[in-house]
C-alpha cells in the first residue's frame, strides 16, 4: 500500500496508543508524582481547557490527587466509586471507575493501576487513565 503524501511511515502493528500524558495544569509539581496521569486523546482538548473552566487551583488539586493518591478520598472535592456497568475495570489490573467531582463544574472518571507494565520499557509503575471529562452541569 503506498504511503500518503507527508506521512513518514506506516505505524507498526499494535502501535495505536489512545492515551497521552495529561500534563499538570500550570506546570510541574515540586514533588515527583507517584502515578503517571494519562488522558484519552479525544479528551485532550477538554483537559487543556479545564483550568479555564474550573480554575487553575481546582485543576491542579485534581491532578495532584490522581498523581499522588488516586485510591484515597480527595482532600478537596468529592469522589465515589461508580456503580453498575461503568464501575468494571476496563483493563486488567486497574481499579473500578472512580467519579471525581470538581466544585460542581466538572466531573472526571478515571481508573488507576499501582503496578502497570504498559509502555516501551515494561517496568512496573503507577498509572492513572482519565476515561472521561464532563464540563457540563448535572
What do these predicted ranges mean?
Residues 1-106, 113-138:
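Basic, Lys/Arg-enriched alpha-helical interface segments
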Amino acid at each position: 500500500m503506498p504511503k500518503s503524501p507527508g506521512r513518514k511511515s506506516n505505524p507498526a502493528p499494535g502501535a495505536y496508543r489512545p492515551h497521552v500524558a495529561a500534563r499538570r495544569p500550570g506546570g510541574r509539581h515540586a514533588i515527583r508524582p507517584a502515578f503517571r496521569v494519562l488522558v484519552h486523546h479525544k479528551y485532550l482538548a477538554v483537559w487543556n481547557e479545564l483550568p479555564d473552566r474550573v480554575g487553575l487551583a481546582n485543576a491542579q488539586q485534581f491532578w495532584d490527587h490522581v498523581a499522588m493518591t488516586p485510591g484515597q478520598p480527595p482532600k478537596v472535592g468529592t469522589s465515589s466509586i461508580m456503580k453498575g456497568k461503568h464501575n468494571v475495570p476496563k483493563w486488567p489490573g486497574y481499579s473500578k471507575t472512580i467519579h471525581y467531582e470538581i466544585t460542581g463544574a466538572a466531573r472526571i472518571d478515571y481508573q488507576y493501576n499501582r503496578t502497570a507494565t504498559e509502555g516501551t520499557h515494561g517496568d512496573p509503575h503507577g498509572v492513572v487513565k482519565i476515561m472521561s471529562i464532563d464540563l457540563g452541569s448535572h
